[in-house]
Curated annotation (Swiss-Prot):
InterPro entries: Adeno_fibre, Adeno_fibre_knob, Adenobir_fibre_prot_rpt/shaft, Adenovirus_pIV-like_att, Attachment_protein_shaft_sf. One of its GO terms (cellular component) is host cell nucleus. Induction: Expressed in the late phase of the viral replicative cycle. The tail region anchors the fiber to penton base capsomers, whereas the shaft, built from several repeated motifs, allows the knob to protrude from the virion. Belongs to the adenoviridae fiber family. Homotrimer. Interacts with host receptor CXCAR. Interacts (via N-terminal tail region) with pentons. Keywords: Capsid protein, Host nucleus, Host-virus interaction, Late protein, Viral attachment to host adhesion receptor, Viral attachment to host cell, Virion, Virus entry into host cell. The lineage of its organism: Viruses, Varidnaviria, Bamfordvirae, Preplasmiviricota, Tectiliviricetes. It comes from the Viruses. The keyword Ubl conjugation does not apply. GO terms for biological process: adhesion receptor-mediated virion attachment to host cell; cell adhesion; symbiont entry into host cell. It comes from Human adenovirus F serotype 41. Forms spikes that protrude from each vertex of the icosahedral capsid. Interacts with host receptor CXCAR to provide virion initial attachment to target cell. Fiber proteins are shed during virus entry, when virus is still at the cell surface. This is Fiber protein 2.
Length: 387
């Protein structure tokens, strides 16, 4: 058999025909797998690889190594870097140290919240209730009405007429006759009352009535009503009514009867116990003070026994019975209008008017006999009234 002649340009490396363009991307022999291989450049069989596989300067296969990755003795090693809090390095594991309210849940970093904080749409937010509002990215109080802010940004109550803020208290700012202690009330004087229906009412006495227009008028009753003239005030009492040296140690009878511009006075006093039963001093003084309206002030005489003779009502506003402040100037004890009389051979009696800085006063003085009970005779005096 004759041997086939081989051409001079025959290439024994498959594919043998290097001048023809292959019709498929890989033209390796059918007994070679295309996995991991490629023809690059054409006609050259080469490995097909991607990062991190590469070749070194010696055209050897090797790996691209990043930070903290080393190749020692043919083995890859990872070096855990030095960390700073909150990162941790434990058993070659990188971790994150957390504290409340930060926690790790389901392998994720999360934020623990409590009302009114909440997480909504992956955002931390706050639930604002009534009276609160978020304005300009800030939580603020939503005031209305009389509430507002002062110049320091503090919440305040704006108080208008009739009210004021005193420290931490809201106070009614009232003038008399209003009074505000625990509640708003009215100060009532004689002639006024509050009815059971809560209305302010004028108290009408005998002979008075309301007309059809609600005005006070004299009653048109056919009965004749007489209003007694208050001409006498006295301190008559069946029991002790005067405290000179001790409580209720004397009984004082003082009677003032008005007649025009004059008042006739009668006075007697009797000691009942203690030092008044055996006098140690040779004189005794008793002062009865009154205010500018003629009301008896606190003194030796019990005020409940100082009454009008005609009605037996406690005497009040008895200005018409007071010593005239022009005739008897206040605190002028040597004024000639004062009286000094001899009421018995051994006892003298005097009365000084208006021995006081304001208001009115009677100052009665008796001489006394030491060692004997104090019971001087009745004395009579007269003076000009204020009205």
């Amino acid at each position: 058999m004759k041997r086939t002649r081989i051409e001079d340009d025959f290439n024994p490396v498959y594919p043998y025909d290097t001048f023809s363009t292959p019709s498929i991307p890989y033209v390796a022999p059918p007994f070679v797998s295309s996995d991991g291989l490629q023809e690059k450049p054409p006609g050259v069989l080469a490995l097909k690889y991607t990062d991190p596989i590469t070749t070194n300067a010696k055209h050897e296969l090797t790996l691209k190594l990043g930070s903290n990755i080393t190749l020692e003795n043919g083995l890859l090693s990872a070096t855990v870097p030095t960390v700073s809090p909150p990162l941790t390095n434990s058993n070659n594991s990188l971790g994150l140290a957390t504290s409340a309210p930060i926690a790790v849940s389901a392998n994720s970093l999360t934020l623990a919240t409590a009302a009114p904080l909440t997480v909504s749409n992956n955002q931390l937010s706050i639930n604002a209730g009534r009276g609160l509002v978020i304005t300009n990215n800030a939580l603020t109080v939503n005031p209305t009405g009389a509430l507002g802010f002062n110049n320091t940004g503090a919440l305040q109550l704006n108080a208008a007429g009739g009210m004021r803020v005193d420290g931490a208290n809201l106070i009614l700012h009232v003038a008399y006759p209003f009074e505000a202690i625990n509640q708003l009330t009215l100060r009532l004087e004689n002639g006024l009352e509050v009815t059971s229906g809560g209305k302010l009412n004028v108290k009408l006495g005998s002979g008075l009535q309301f007309d059809s227009n609600g005005r006070i008028a004299i009653s048109n009753s056919n009965r004749t009503r007489s209003v007694p003239s208050l001409t006498t005030i006295w301190s008559i009492s069946p029991t002790p009514n005067c405290s000179i040296y001790e409580t209720q140690d004397a009984n004082l009878f003082l009677c003032l009867t008005k007649n025009g511009a004059h008042v006739l006075g009668t006075i007697t006093i009797k000691g009942l116990k203690g030092a008044l039963r055996e006098m140690h001093d040779n004189a005794l003084s008793l002062k009865l003070p009154f205010d500018n309206q003629g009301n008896l002030l606190n003194c030796a005489l019990e005020s409940s026994t100082w009454r009008y003779q005609e009605t037996n009502a406690v005497a009040s506003n008895a200005l018409t019975f007071m010593p005239n402040s022009t005739v008897y100037p206040r605190n002028k004890t040597a004024h000639p209008g004062n009286m000094l009389i001899q009421i018995s051979p051994n006892i003298t009696f005097s009365v000084v008017y208006n021995e006081i800085n304001s208001g009115y006063a009677f100052t009665f003085k008796w001489s006394a006999e030491p060692g004997k009970p104090f019971h001087p005779p009745t004395a009579v005096f007269c003076y000009i009234t204020e009205q």
